[in-house]
From Swiss-Prot:
It comes from Halobacterium salinarum (strain ATCC 700922 / JCM 11081 / NRC-1). Essential cell division protein that forms a contractile ring structure (Z ring) at the future cell division site. The regulation of the ring assembly controls the timing and the location of cell division. One of the functions of the FtsZ ring is to recruit other cell division proteins to the septum to produce a new cell wall between the dividing cells. Binds GTP and shows GTPase activity. FtsZ1 rings form just prior to cell division events. SMART domains: Tubulin, Tubulin_C. It is found in: Cytoplasm. InterPro entries: Cell_div_FtsZ, Cell_div_FtsZ_CS, FtsZ/CetZ, FtsZ_C, Tub_FtsZ_C, Tubulin/FtsZ_2-layer-sand-dom, Tubulin/FtsZ_GTPase_sf, Tubulin_FtsZ_GTPase. GO terms for biological process: cell division; FtsZ-dependent cytokinesis; protein polymerization. Residues 8-19 have a biased composition (Acidic residues). Keywords: Cell cycle, Cell division, Cytoplasm, GTP-binding, Nucleotide-binding, Septation. Homodimer. Polymerizes to form a dynamic ring structure in a strictly GTP-dependent manner. Interacts directly with several other division proteins. FtsZ1 and FtsZ2 could also form copolymers whose stoichiometry is balanced by CdrS regulation. Its main location: cytoplasm. This is Cell division protein FtsZ 1. Residues 1-38, 358-396 are annotated as: Disordered. Pfam families: FtsZ_C (PF12327), Tubulin (PF00091).
Amino acid sequence: MDSIVQDAIDEAEESEDSASEPADVAGGGGDTVPTGTMTDNELEDVLQELQTNITVVGCGGAGSNTVDRMATEGIHGADLVAANTDVQHLVDIEADTKILMGQQKTKGRGAGSLPQVGEEAAIESQGEIRDSIAGSDMVFVTAGLGGGTGTGSAPVVAKAAREQGALTIAIVTTPFTAEGEVRRTNAEAGLERLRDVADTVIVVPNDRLLDSVGKLPVREAFKVSDEVLMRSVKGITELITKPGLVNLDFADVRTVMEKGGVAMIGLGEADSDAKAADSVQSALRSPLLDVDISSANSALVNVTGGPGMSIEEAEGVVEQLYDRIDPDARIIWGTSIDEQIQEEMRTMVVVTGVDSPQIYGRNEAAEGDGPAQESTPEPEPEPQAGSEIEDIDYVE
C-alpha cells in the first residue's frame, strides 16, 4: 500500500533505533497586535508574543516511545514530555522533560498492566504534570490504550491540560485483538474517560494496521504503531509551526479540534504524475480511516511536499476531499514544506464527528444530547482527577 503506513513499516524494518525552533507562524486569537511602522526587532517581539506553545506528553510505554521517535525525527516547535511509571524504560527515552509518575505507589517498577495503578500514579504526580504543561496553548496526550500506565494516566494528564486552558488533543492506539479481552476492555474504559476530558480524541486502531503489518514480527508491528502516532502528532503540530504555501494558525486548528469529540486519521503519500489525487486517495483508503467520511462535521488537512510543490497541487488534494465530505462540513487545510521530500506528496486527513466500528464506547449516545448527558452526571463537581468517571471500571 502506497501510504505513510507503508513508510512506517519500512522505518521499523530498517532499524531498532531508528531542533526545535521557535514557531515561524502562530495565531493567538485574542491578542492585541501593535500597528504602525515598526522596526525588525519590534516585529520579532510581536512574533514571540504570538508564538503558540505546544507540548506533547507521552504517557506510558507507547506514549513515551512516540515522544522518543519525535525527538529522533525532529519536530518543529513543540516541547516533549515523557511520563511513565517504569524508570528503566524512562531512562532510555529522549525528551525535554521526563516525569517518573507515582514513585511512592510503584517505586519506579511500572503499573503491572493495571490502569487503576497508572491512574493513581498520575494523580500522585499531578504537580509535576501541571508544571510540565504550564503555559501551553495546545497539549497532545499520546498513549497506547489497554495497558496500565498509559490507559490510567492519559485521562489525568488530559484533564489537567484542559483545566489549565489548553486545547487538548489525545492521540491513542487501541490494542490488537491478539492482546486479549482484558486489554480491550481496559482500552474501552480508558477511551471513555478520555472522551470526557479531552477536546478531541484521535483513535488509531491497531487492528486496522494488521492489513499492513500482518507479516511483520510482533515487536516491529508495535514499532509501526508508535510510528503512526508520531507522524500524526507531528503532522498536526507542523501545520502551525512550519512555514508553507498555505499557513494555518492556532485559531484555525482550534476551530476544528475544540470539542471535536472522537476523530479518525488517514495518512497517505504518492510520487506519481497525479500525486495530488493519488495521495489523498491513499489517505482516504488508509486502513486507519475506517469510516464513512461523508457524515463528518469537520476535517483538518495537512499537505506536505518538497520545495517544488505548487499551490495547484495542494488545492487538488482539498478538492478531492470536498467531493467526498458533507458540503456543510468545515474543512481547514494547510501545507508544509519538507526539504527532504523530493517528488513525493503526503496527505494527512483528520475527520471529526464520526462513527466507526473500530471505536469503542458511546458512539450512538454521543450523537444525541439527551441520553449522553444523562449518563454522565458527575463532571460538574470535579472533585479530583479521575473521579468524574467512577461509573466505568477497569478490570484486572
